[in-house]
């Protein structure tokens, strides 16, 4: 009993000390105008994707081998969903998806959230429906989540990573 109490008190003291030592975030690192500009960039990204403007889409991404797109894969050895690193791989993936048939991205702009992580990095999150016929998808609108990390490059904000995740169906209620 004494050992249990001692362990509990020690853990409590360590945990409380760790929380007290954590720096408090007091201010958003990006101002409202910057967050609004990133939201506008997101809207432009969606418009370019829906118009299959591959050249302009290329310009929206950070030009780096570290740029990442997570998307559906058509190659079974890559798995069902995969990461595509670097601009050449991303350009090819976007071209393959866009050339497969109709692709429509419909973000729920009322739920679009953009936050600053640092003065030079932001993150956006939005649920959306995507209609696509790529890689065994049947062209039916389905729910997805899109998470983008934005990087300030000079005066512009570029997509450093775009992660598209399918929302799994709600399990049937057990009765």
Task: Please describe what each predicted stretch is.
Residues 36, 54, 58-116:
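A solvent-exposed, acidic/Ser-Thr-rich amphipathic alpha-helical stretch
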Residues 7-16:
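Bacterial N-terminal signal peptides
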Residues 20-60, 76, 173-175:
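Short, low-complexity N-terminal intrinsically disordered segments enriched in polar/charged residues
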Residues 1-4:
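Positively charged n-region of N-terminal signal peptides that target proteins for export
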Residues 101, 131-140:
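Short, cysteine-centered beta-strand-loop-beta hairpins and adjacent loop/turn segments enriched
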């Amino acid at each position: 009993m004494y050992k249990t109490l001692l362990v509990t008190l020690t853990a409590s003291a360590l945990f409380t000390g760790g929380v007290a030592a954590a720096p408090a975030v007091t201010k958003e690192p990006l101002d409202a105008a910057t967050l609004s500009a990133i939201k506008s960039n997101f809207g432009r990204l969606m418009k370019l994707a829906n118009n299959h403007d591959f050249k302009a889409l290329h310009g929206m991404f950070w030009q780096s081998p570290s740029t990442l797109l997570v998307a559906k894969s058509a190659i079974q050895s890559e798995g069902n969903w995969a990461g595509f690193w670097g601009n050449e791989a991303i350009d090819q993936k976007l071209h393959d998806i866009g050339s497969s048939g109709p692709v429509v991205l419909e973000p729920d702009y009322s739920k679009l959230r953009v936050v600053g992580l640092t003065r030079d990095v932001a993150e956006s999150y939005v649920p959306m429906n995507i209609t696509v016929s790529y890689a065994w998808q049947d062209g039916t609108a389905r729910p997805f989540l899109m998470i983008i990390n934005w990087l300030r490059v000079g005066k512009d904000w570029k997509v450093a990573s775009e992660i598209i995740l399918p929302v799994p169906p709600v399990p049937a209620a057990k009765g």
